């Protein structure tokens, strides 16, 4: 995994089933039409929990308002945000934390950050990692070009990828890049306008297929035919559903050691040192992608990718996570029911 041999000039601007009712959408989604990772996690949990157990709790996803608190049920705060987020600052106060039966973190990295930066005690929370539906074992296509895929929002590194691919095209033509990226996934289609120049530049690249926002079902189908996750992230994430899903599908993840990607991707990914300068980042990324394309079909790497798929389809599956959620909530319900009715919280 060598650094890029190319001298790059950075050119792009730095610019499923169960329905959640309207009240839950208003409370837990950034937009009522949003279908990002937060919304998929909430819908996925409701789909798999015993309905009676679900109805005994009030779930709040990251953003808390006083009117969201239910005094008659245990309140679960399920965090997907960072501690630096303005919406998280209330957790500095013990009186605010006391409103929740449990604070659920999506990674150990996230819990540690909330402890160090906001003083959220470890005993107030629990880590239940994000997850995805299992992928059936499958073989990657061998009779065509290697397919790279990017399926996150435009502001999370797409500009770095565009610059890297532009220069990689001058060296080889044995790959294609499928890009599924738009703020429409959050119901914020207007935000795409600031990235139109970037989208136009992507349209100039012969190896790039730009699809915008599509359903998660479509993404999952595409992942079974893809080989490499091309995700030069420039956005600190507390967990990464993109990486989880791609690695469960057996893709080679080429990602930086940024935020919780180190925990999510572990040693299976081709991980490199993150660069703050976009031009340097693009240069480094072009080189690593070049090496990944050269190495993809090597027997040792193929064996690792098979082990990776087994690992992620087990440890990051909804089968495991739903069982963990059931255990947590069953215990919390028993504690809640044993309290005097006049004392439901603080917990």
Where are these regions (language model features)?
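A charged, aromatic-enriched C-terminal amphipathic alpha-helix characteristic of glycosyltransferases
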Residues: 35-40, 276, 280, 297-340
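Active-site proximal beta-strand in glycosyltransferases
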Residues: 57-87, 101-105, 126-128
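Donor nucleotide-sugar binding/catalytic pocket of nucleotide-sugar-dependent glycosyltransferases
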Residues: 101-115, 120-137
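Conserved donor-binding/catalytic core segment of Leloir-type glycosyltransferases
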Residues: 140-157, 162-165, 169, 178
């Amino acid at each position: 995994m060598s650094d890029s041999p190319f001298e790059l000039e950075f050119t792009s601007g730095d610019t499923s089933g169960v329905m959640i009712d309207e009240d839950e959408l208003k409370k837990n989604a950034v937009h009522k039409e949003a279908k990002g990772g937060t919304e998929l996690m909430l819908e996925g949990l409701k789909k798999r929990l015993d309905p009676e157990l679900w109805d005994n709790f009030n779930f709040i996803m990251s953003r808390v308002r006083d009117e969201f608190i239910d005094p008659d049920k245990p309140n679960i705060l399920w965090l997907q945000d960072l501690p630096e987020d303005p919406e998280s600052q209330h957790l500095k106060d013990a009186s605010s934390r006391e409103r929740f039966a449990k604070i659920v973190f999506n990674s150990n990295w996230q819990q540690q950050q909330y402890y160090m930066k906001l003083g959220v005690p470890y005993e107030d929370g629990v880590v239940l990692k994000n997850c995805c539906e299992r992928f059936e074992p499958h073989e990657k296509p061998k009779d065509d070009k290697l397919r790279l895929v990017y399926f996150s929002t435009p502001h999370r590194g797409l500009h770095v990828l565009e610059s890297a691919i532009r220069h990689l095209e001058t060296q080889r033509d044995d790959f294609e890049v499928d890009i599924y990226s738009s703020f429409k996934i959050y119901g914020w289609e207007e935000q795409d306008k600031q990235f139109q120049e970037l989208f136009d530049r992507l349209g100039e690249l012969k190896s790039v297929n730009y699809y915008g926002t599509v359903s998660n079902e479509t993404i999952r189908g595409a992942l079974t035919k893809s080989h490499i996750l091309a995700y030069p992230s420039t956005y600190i994430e507390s967990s990464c559903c993109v990486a989880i899903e791609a690695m469960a599908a057996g893709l080679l993840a080429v990602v930086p050691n940024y935020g919780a990607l180190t925990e999510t991707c572990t040693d299976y990914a081709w991980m490199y040192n993150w660069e703050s300068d976009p031009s340097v980042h693009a240069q480094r990324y072009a080189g690593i992608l070049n090496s990944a394309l050269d190495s993809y079909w090597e027997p040792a790497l193929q064996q690792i990718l098979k082990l990776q798929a087994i690992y992620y389809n087990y440890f990051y599956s909804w089968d495991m996570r739903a069982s963990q959620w059931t255990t947590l909530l069953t215990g919390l319900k028993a504690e809640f029911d044993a309290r005097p009715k006049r004392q439901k919280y603080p917990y």
